[in-house]
Amino acid sequence: MDMTHSGNSNEIRWYAGIPVGSNPLILLDFFTIMVISAVLCWGILLLAQFYFDGHVALPHLYGAAVIAFDLCLLFSVFYVIVSFIVMRNGYVARYRLDMTGAHCENIKCRPKSTVPGFFHFCSYPVAEPQTYNRCVEKHVSWADVSSFAELRSLRVLILKGRRGTLMRIYCPDSQKYETVLTFLNDRIASERS
């Protein structure tokens, strides 16, 4: 696990394993999408019934609800298959915080956890991946960050801008969380002054 300070306090780097299928933040997003999808599906089916038949009765309400529920169930099964079988409940993120901003590379590979267990709820320490297929990079400039939110129990810091969440920063342990929190407080304070 690379948790380097690059010789000075101007840069912090580390790797973190991020659970997918058991991550509370991802599950919350997924649940929200499922509720919105179910309501939209139910509403669209009722509008279609009204358009084609001119009225909506109680059996139509029930039938639309069953179809909306079945659709959500299908999406949930697909989510479980992708999360636990395709992605093996995790991916690796390489974070770098420096004077220019926050940088994150999401690396698609099999995370080699340095702590035992397959079913993690929070981010966890991982060894540096030797090989990987793909990686997606995201950069957030400190000028775009207006504030950040702490989710201490999950060891996550959320960078916020004018349009909402810019980046989630996952920390593999409490020590790294405190280091990153101090760094963010210093950077945001210096950007405001």
Predicted regions located by residue number:
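Eukaryotic phosphoinositide-binding membrane-targeting regions
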Residues: 19, 132, 138
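Short amphipathic alpha-helical segments, especially helix-boundary/capping motifs
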Residues: 57-58, 75-77, 119-122, 154-158
